[in-house]
Amino acid sequence: MKVDLTIEYRGKLITPNQIKLLIALHKTKSQNEAAKLLNIKPSSFNIQLKRLENKLGVKLYYSSPNGTVLTDAGLEILETYNSYSKRLKNHFFTVSGFVSGEIAKILFGNPIITSFDNALKLLKMGFVDVLGVDDSYWIYRLGDERFLKSEIGSCDFNIFLIAYDNFVMVSKKEFNYKNLVGIRFSSQRIVYNILKKEGIKFKVKVRVKNPFRAIELVNEGYSLFLNESLLRYIDGDFNVIYPNFYEKTVHAINFISFGKDIEIDKKEIKKIKKLGFKI
């Protein structure tokens, strides 16, 4: 029984293994037979099912003359799973961070571009075939089997390093290291580590998830370390400075593929370079 989709029910995530419990019980109408189908002990099956009920706060099954059957809530969960499963078979979903999203628009046409915490939520729900990652730190985390099991369950994936980017200094007036706007889930951590090593004092006054919101805040007087590939989005009267440690800010833009191949032709490479990325 292959189930690799996580769904949400009443604000709680139901994992693939938990969905298997309901599918097996619905199919066999017997906890003992369902346990055999899943190759686990009946006691283990019952414990897992009880835990799922406690987690969701609803009754999922009851005894009847026809055997052990699912309640309306249990059937609703399976209907939701089947609906999502059918949609996924007919669609290809690319989800990217804001920087990798610039590349994803070239490679995949119509990606979902969002903050990485939202991307992880979609990944947990099984809605991601290709994931664009702005910060290589998350490549490390996703490569940790313990993180995968706790967040999305076990799965196989391939990592594709597509391009490199650097950071530049953007400000309305004079760049102020002590009045920075930070971007969550970006590779700005690389810059902060460099500043610490260089002995440059700095302070992040406000943090946002969206680099385009960060660019707007530059108009309010904040200074920003921005991905060079996003320079085309800034106002013409902004100051742009390439720091002395510019070369040290280089970082990879990766894509994670869950069972899909990623191939790039020469035309796409040319377009990616035109955006300001390095390949």
Curated annotation (Swiss-Prot):
GO MF, one annotated term: transcription cis-regulatory region binding
One GO term of the biological process aspect: regulation of DNA-templated transcription
Matching Pfam families: HTH_1
UniProt name for this protein: Uncharacterized HTH-type transcriptional regulator MJ1120
Alphabetic keyword roster: DNA-binding, Transcription, Transcription regulation
HTH lysR-type domain residues: 14-71
Taxonomic lineage of the native organism: Archaea, Methanobacteriati, Methanobacteriota, Methanomada group, Methanococci
Family membership: Belongs to the LysR transcriptional regulatory family.
Start-end of DNA-binding region: 31-50
InterPro entries tied to this protein: Tscrpt_reg_HTH_LysR (IPR000847), WH-like_DNA-bd_sf (IPR036388), WH_DNA-bd_sf (IPR036390)
Organism for this UniProt entry: Methanocaldococcus jannaschii (strain ATCC 43067 / DSM 2661 / JAL-1 / JCM 10045 / NBRC 100440) (Methanococcus jannaschii)
